[in-house]
Amino acid sequence: MRYEIFVTVWGKHFVRKFVEFALASQLAPGNIPALSAVADVTYRIYTDRASENYFQPEITKLKKLAIVEFVFYEDLAYRNVALSDAINNSDPTIIKHYVQRETSRHHMNLAKESSETAIMLLDSDFIFSDGSFAHIHEQRVKGKKAYAGMFVRLIEEKAIPILRSLLPKPLSARELVRIGMDNMHPLPRSMFIDAKKPSTYPTQINWNVNDNGFVANCFFPHPLMFEQRPEIINYFSTMDYEVLLRAVTVNDDLYYCQSSEDLMFCKISPESYFGSMEAGSPPSIDVMARFVIFNTNIRHRLFMENPVRYLAREDEKAFRAVEREARSYTEAIYKNAELLLAEFSPPDPKMTLYAKSFLGPIENFISPQIHSRMKNILPK
């Protein structure tokens, strides 16, 4: 078996954050070392030439466990220029997603030449609990062709001092959940069922379980692993919207991690990230039914209807009660969505388009990226 791991990162601040926190967590015994003991591992890093030295000296530890390849933006074509030139002439607030998409496509094109290969797409600030990568491999050995998981976003300014005091010691899952609970970013906090300032774009709904953890229902988990298929390479949106569902056509081939005990990971973002967001409506059944019609595909239901348990301390009775409530809530959302679709007039061109996006194959899904390209021609 083979694994080809992807990350794209550039600039001193971001590279040093990657090696100090993300890479340090990945070098825990149950992560890359466990993977490299049972499979061939290539770790492909996309960056610019000016950033190459910032990976030192920590990258030498990774080279003992995996083949490490650097691919430079200066050597990649984007339209009629080098990708590095496109980066320098683009809006810095949105360029990361474009770079990630283009470089991950390049990574997948390189990997498709290898047999028995699985792709692992990582963000440069993913911090994993020890044993996470081993669990991904365990599920692949059992026959799963893809692995999905959802991260907890942390406030960078608060979490970094804590993580710095702990790493490179391996992080336990419960330890990382507690860090997530105590230093959670305002963005996921706005997605709790009882949030005082609800999100305008509720991609997940979270439920507190006292001080023992929380439960999350999520539409768009991250594609942590998938076996290569030609249909995946030319995805258009950000990778969490469609890659997993292009990777597997049969839901049983996909493993969705529903317990932090098996795999836990966090992402660190500045507190100012999405800091100017306005408050949305409370996530009532009707609000969420409209959200699923206009912002998801029916196959995302696979994730949303299966709550994820983030466990900091045991309380089986409390977790089961919240999970039952979360499942009932999700079931009601989709029932209401069916009723709303039945009420809309068939001649409505806008509704017809979104009904196809929601009910059709994943290739028909109008993601935010596709919507932004089509907004001038979409029916009003």
Regions found by a protein language model. Give the residues of each.
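Boundary detector for helix-to-coil junctions that initiate low-complexity/charged tails
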Residues: S357, I362-K380
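N-terminal anchoring/stem segment of glycosyltransferases
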Residues: M1-Y78
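Conserved catalytic core of nucleotide-sugar-dependent glycosyltransferases
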Residues: D85-I87, D91-H97, T103, H107-M108, ...
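Active-site-proximal specificity loops/subdomain of glycosyltransferases
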Residues: Y46-T117
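Secretory-pathway lumenal glyco-enzymes, predominantly type II signal-anchor Golgi glycosyltransferases
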Residues: V7-V9, H13-A22, A28, A86, ...
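Short beta-strand-to-loop acidic/aromatic patch adjacent to the donor-nucleotide binding site
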Residues: K112-S129
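Short, solvent-exposed loop/turn segments at secondary-structure junctions
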Residues: W10-K12, A50-E52, D125-I127, V152-I155
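Long C-terminal appendages of very large multidomain proteins
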Residues: F214-F365
